[in-house]
Every structure is written in structure tokens, then in C-alpha cells.
Design a protein with these regions (language model features):
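Acidic, surface-exposed loops and disordered segments
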Residues: 1-173
Length: 173
């Protein structure tokens, strides 16, 4: 049997995306509290995510949503990393409020945001090891939250993933 890379490209990207999910799960977390969630979006769900981003563009007139909605369709998948918000109870004031009790519920604990960033960075590191191209997008994360793709998560980043001869996430207009 001969497996042509061009024919197997999607499966290779999904394999890398699965490894990225492992990196998300094993990334260090504040106080060891695992509040992180991850998922892979592909196929028809990738189109749904793009459509949700176009809805955000229509509502906000922010061009980033329109540009990124088209851009994610140039890849094979999007890896989502999100967090179920929970204050760490450290009263560190890193969020801008003196104590956790003073912090409004709508304001995320700074450590929740840090944990999502660390997990996304860990996932992108694995993607680089697999030699697939990525782009971390807040816009696609907003679309994912709109669709409820990571239930309970109020902060979501999306990592678009591709394995083509030219990185589709690099020269964007």
C-alpha cells in the first residue's frame, strides 16, 4: 500500500490536534486546579464556527471576525482551549481588585486567564513538534463560546491548524 501525503494530510492534522489536546490537559495549572477544557473542531462544525464568527462580524463590525472566519476554513481543524472560571482564592489583586471577594463575578481570575495561555502555548509547542502550522485566535474562541462548544467555559482561545506547503495563517489581509 502507498499512502500519499496529500491524501493523508487531514488525518495527519487531526493526529497532531489530538496530541495538542494532551498538551492542554497536562499543561501546568494554578494551584493544580484543572479547570481547562479542550476540543477539536473539524468538518461541518468548522463551517458552523466560521458562520458564528460572521454573525459576530455582523453584530460588531469588527473586521477581525470576517477575516478569521474565512481563514479558519483554509485549515483542517481548530483546537479549542477554554476554562471554567473559578477564582483561586489567593487574594493576590492581580485581577485589579484587592481581594477575590471584591472581584465582580464577570471579571475572570487572572490565574484562569494565565492557565488558558499556558495551555494554548503548550498545545502550539506540540503542533510545532508535529510540523503543522497554527494560529491562535481569540475571534474563533468567541465564535466557539457563542456556539457553546465548550460548555461552562467563559474564556476560550482557538488554535487553527493546517499542514499545507504555505502557512495559510501567516500572510493575512
Amino acid at each position: 500500500m502507498i499512502i500519499n501525503q496529500r491524501d493523508d494530510r487531514h488525518a495527519q492534522v487531526i493526529d497532531a490536534a489530538r496530541r495538542m489536546l494532551t498538551a492542554i490537559r497536562t499543561a501546568p495549572k494554578a494551584k493544580g486546579n484543572d479547570l481547562i477544557e479542550g476540543a477539536i473542531v473539524e468538518g461541518d462544525d468548522l463551517r458552523r464556527l466560521s458562520d458564528a464568527m460572521l454573525e459576530l462580524y455582523a453584530e460588531t463590525s469588527r473586521p477581525v471576525y470576517q477575516r478569521d472566519a474565512a481563514n479558519i476554513l483554509q485549515g483542517d481543524a481548530v483546537v479549542l482551549v477554554g476554562i471554567r472560571p473559578q477564582p483561586m482564592g489567593l487574594n493576590c489583586a492581580h485581577c485589579g481588585f484587592p481581594t477575590c471577594a471584591d472581584k465582580p463575578a464577570a471579571v475572570p481570575c487572572a490565574f484562569n486567564s494565565i492557565d488558558v495561555g499556558i495551555a494554548a502555548g503548550s498545545a502550539c509547542s506540540v503542533a510545532a513538534d508535529c510540523r503543522v502550522d497554527t494560529r491562535t485566535l481569540f475571534s474563533a474562541g468567541m465564535g466557539a463560546m457563542r456556539l457553546g462548544l465548550l460548555p461552562g467555559c467563559r474564556l476560550v482561545l482557538a488554535i487553527a491548524v493546517s499542514a499545507t506547503s504555505k502557512n495559510p495563517f501567516f500572510d493575512r489581509k
